[in-house]
Amino acid sequence: MQGILPYLINGVSAGGQYALIAIGYTLVYGILRLINFAHGDVFMVAGLIMVYTTASMPMYIAIPLVLLCTVILGFAIERAAYKPLRTAPRMSLMISAIGVSYLIQNVAFYITGGLAQPVKKPIPWISDSIVLFGESTKRVTVVTPILTIALVFVLVALIKKTKIGMGMRAAAKDFETAQLMGVKINSVISMTFVIGSFLEAVGAMLYFTNYPTVGISSGGMPGLKAFVAAVFGGIGSIPGAVVGAFLIGLCEEIIKGVGQSTFSDAFTFALLIVVLCVKPTGLFGEKVTDKV
């Protein structure tokens, strides 16, 4: 048990990071029925912004700037790439999302020269080492799941208690009827992207605290795993995305703990195939029927 404990701790931490990304997938899909393929790339951009700002600015300026820039990027993507295609076939939206993903990667390649950027100044305090249950780890390992759960509670309260949250629930339930009832769909969708981008920025700062560099491909694997978590839990369901993320994080680390780290990534994508074959709606998802 002592040997597996560090892997369990790391698994909970990884699950929290995946959850913050997965919520963005599930929020957008819940309203637009769109898989935002650029989501992982926004995560990568947040990491690069963190690298550049923390290296040259005080932390009390750098951290809010990372959040602000990532939110602006998410908002701009929605307005420029998705809003003009609101009434277009769903395939057009998907192609646009793929195009945005490649655009972000190429812009990042131009800025960085294709070189991974070193994290010169990790965020203080959370990057410090601590001893937990007799094992040495970084404080971010403990902070991540606590902060993730706190943000999820805040998000659920926002969705249930605020006017914009009511609009999000209405649009997710029936997009066309919500429009007819006077819900400001454009504002609702923009806020959805803003929230998802904010959570991604938080997740990126936590995630890249554990890594020495950030490159243009750094958002690929976390983004894909978060997508699997969203599908596993039931894409469109916030609790499902969170549960799926924590389960995947734990399973991956347990596989590493038993000496099969080579197969930890393979397990995640094998799980995606199994879920799609056995229960396509996921653990908490509801079957969606298209209206004629």
Briefly describe each language-model feature range.
Residues 1-20, 49, 60-61, 88-93, ...:
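Membrane-interfacial amphipathic/re-entrant helices at transmembrane-helix boundaries
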Residues 9, 31-76, 80, 85, ...:
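Membrane-embedded helix boundary and interhelical linker motif in transport proteins
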Residues 14, 133-214, 238-243:
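Helix-loop-helix "hairpin" substructures at the membrane interface of multi-pass membrane proteins
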Residues 18-22, 57-68, 190-200, 206-270:
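Transmembrane alpha-helical segments in multi-pass inner-membrane proteins
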Residues 38, 60-61, 91-92, 163, ...:
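Residues that define the loop-to-transmembrane-helix transition and helix capping
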Residues 47-52, 67-73, 100-108, 147-156, ...:
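Hydrophobic core segments of alpha-helical transmembrane domains in multi-pass membrane transport
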Residues 58-100, 107, 243-248, 279:
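Alpha-helical transmembrane segments within multi-pass membrane transporters and channels
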Residues 84-161, 188-191, 254, 259, ...:
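Transmembrane helix-bundle core of multi-pass membrane transporters
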